[in-house]
From Swiss-Prot:
The gene is yaeP. InterPro entries: UPF0253 (IPR009624). Belongs to the UPF0253 family. Pfam families: UPF0253 (PF06786). This is UPF0253 protein YaeP. It comes from the Bacteria.
Length: 66
C-alpha cells in the first residue's frame, strides 16, 4: 500500500472498514472509470492517453489470460 497515494490509501481503509461499499467487479469498475477519463475533454490529453493506455492493457490482459 505504501506505493499508492494518500487518497487511494484512504479509500482502501474506508472499503476495508465497511464505511464505503465494496465493488465485486473490480476490473469492470476500473475500466468504467478509465473509459470516462479517456473520453473526458476537460482532462489534459496526457491524462486521457494514460487512461486509454491503462484500459487497453487491462482489456488485453483480461482476454489473453482467459
Amino acid at each position: 500500500m505504501e506505493k499508492y497515494c494518500e487518497l487511494i490509501r484512504k479509500r482502501y481503509a474506508e472499503i476495508a472498514s465497511g464505511d464505503l461499499g465494496y465493488v465485486p467487479d473490480a476490473l469492470g469498475c476500473v475500466l468504467k472509470v478509465l473509459n470516462e477519463m479517456a473520453a473526458d475533454d476537460a482532462l489534459s490529453e496526457a491524462v486521457r492517453e494514460k487512461a486509454a493506455y491503462a484500459a487497453a492493457n487491462l482489456l488485453v490482459s483480461d482476454y489473453v489470460n482467459k
